[in-house]
């Protein structure tokens, strides 16, 4: 009884000092447990993430080599958020955003806020102000590598300033994390890859900006270009692989593959066919694809064209796949196998 009284007194004191709701039992409010998500634009990746998309109120890191599809994936998330009336912002530290390409991916440019800051401090101050407003649903920072500290910009070209960017990111993330959760804003950090010199064992790859982002991120996605898509002799897109390296909301290490078509983005119809064949929703006999005894076409490209002309069948297949999401998720985890290219990079 003394313990209960002491606990009640402590809880009352905390609420008087910091306000009502500053401490509570976890099961007291159901909405505390439920997490809102925003689709990624890729059905297979939504399933692999285990919660139907990228989580709101959390930090997400997308990293990979150059031209692997990092910004494309982030722009798809913005487009999906805008479809549901969300407010989005893009911090273009690289000064490289192509508005024409963004529009082709479905981004509403009239309702997208963009900032092109001069320094890393300025970029992160703008990020903090937007997050604290509580009015932004998705905020993308492109990229961590381009967040150059003011001291580096003001200094000479040959000045050695070790750890400056890592300290900047560490301080910013300490300040941002609580605000991001309270405002239910998803912040996506796009990051680049660097090579560690003298690594004999394990992967020599690492991401820029120190280790802080690896710890604070709830989801980390490793995106790679694994091949080219050709139409006769012309390259029209990339085959892309995404691995969920870290996931605080569902089992990680699931791996998915999809096509990114130039000028179009993620090929949703191609995903429907590939996932459909995996779970048996779409039948494949030789080079012919069929669904519910109806032939979709000979060859993958013809089947995609058929679904493009018959969106109602594409919607039917998508509904069937979402109903089999659990089965697909298990298969994606098995496909990833024991292959773990991250080794010491996974937190």
UniProtKB/Swiss-Prot annotation:
User: Where in the cell is the protein located?
Assistant: Cytoplasm
Instruction: Extract one GO BP annotation from the record.
Output: SOS response
Annotated residues for binding of ATP: 64-71
Which Pfam families would you find in this protein's record?
A: RecA, RecA_C
* GO cellular component assignments: cytosol
Q: Which UniProt keywords apply?
A: ATP-binding, Cytoplasm, DNA damage, DNA recombination, DNA repair, DNA-binding, Nucleotide-binding, SOS response
Could you name the domain of life of the organism this protein comes from?
Bacteria
* GO MF entries: ATP binding; ATP hydrolysis activity; ATP-dependent DNA damage sensor activity; damaged DNA binding; single-stranded DNA binding
Question: What is the protein's known function?
Answer: Can catalyze the hydrolysis of ATP in the presence of single-stranded DNA, the ATP-dependent uptake of single-stranded DNA by duplex DNA, and the ATP-dependent hybridization of homologous single-stranded DNAs. It interacts with LexA causing its activation and leading to its autocatalytic cleavage.
Q: Which family does it belong to?
A: Belongs to the RecA family.
What is the protein name given in its UniProt record? Protein RecA
User: What is the source species?
Assistant: Bartonella henselae (strain ATCC 49882 / DSM 28221 / CCUG 30454 / Houston 1)
> Which gene is this protein's source?
recA
């Amino acid at each position: 009884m003394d313990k209960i009284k002491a606990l009640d007194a402590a809880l009352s004191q905390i609420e008087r000092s910091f306000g009502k709701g500053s401490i509570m039992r976890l099961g007291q409010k159901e909405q505390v447990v439920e997490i809102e998500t925003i689709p990624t634009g890729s059905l297979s990746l939504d399933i692999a993430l285990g919660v139907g998309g990228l989580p709101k109120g959390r930090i997400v890191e997308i990293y990979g080599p150059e031209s692997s599809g990092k910004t494309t994936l982030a722009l798809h998330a913005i487009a999906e958020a805008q479809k549901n009336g969300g407010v989005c912002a893009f911090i273009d530290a690289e000064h490289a955003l192509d508005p024409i390409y963004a529009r082709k991916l479905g981004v509403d440019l009239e309702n997208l806020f963009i900032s092109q800051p001069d320094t890393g401090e300025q970029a992160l101050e703008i990020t903090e102000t937007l997050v604290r407003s509580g009015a932004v649903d998705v905020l993308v920072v492109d990229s961590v590598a381009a967040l150059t500290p003011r001291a580096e910009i003001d200094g000479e070209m040959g000045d050695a300033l070790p750890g400056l960017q890592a300290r900047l990111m560490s301080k910013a993330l300490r300040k941002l994390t609580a605000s991001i959760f309270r405002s239910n804003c998803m912040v996506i950090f796009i990051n680049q890859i660097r090579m560690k010199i003298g690594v004999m064992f394990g992967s020599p790859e690492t991401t820029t900006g120190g280790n802080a982002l690896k710890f604070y991120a709830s989801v980390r996605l490793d995106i790679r270009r694994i091949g080219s898509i050709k139409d006769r002799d012309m390259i029209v897109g990339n085959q892309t692989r995404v691995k969920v390296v870290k996931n605080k909301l569902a089992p990680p290490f699931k791996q998915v593959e999809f096509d990114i078509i130039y000028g179009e983005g993620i090929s949703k119809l191609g995903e429907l066919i590939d996932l459909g064949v995996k779970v048996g929703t779409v039948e494949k006999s030789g080079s012919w694809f069929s669904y519910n005894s109806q032939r979709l076409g000979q060859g993958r490209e013809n089947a995609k064209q058929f679904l493009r002309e018959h969106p109602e069948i594409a919607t039917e297949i998508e509904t069937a796949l979402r109903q089999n999401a659990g089965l697909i998720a298990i298969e994606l985890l098995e496909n990833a196998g024991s292959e773990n290219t991250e080794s010491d990079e996974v937190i």
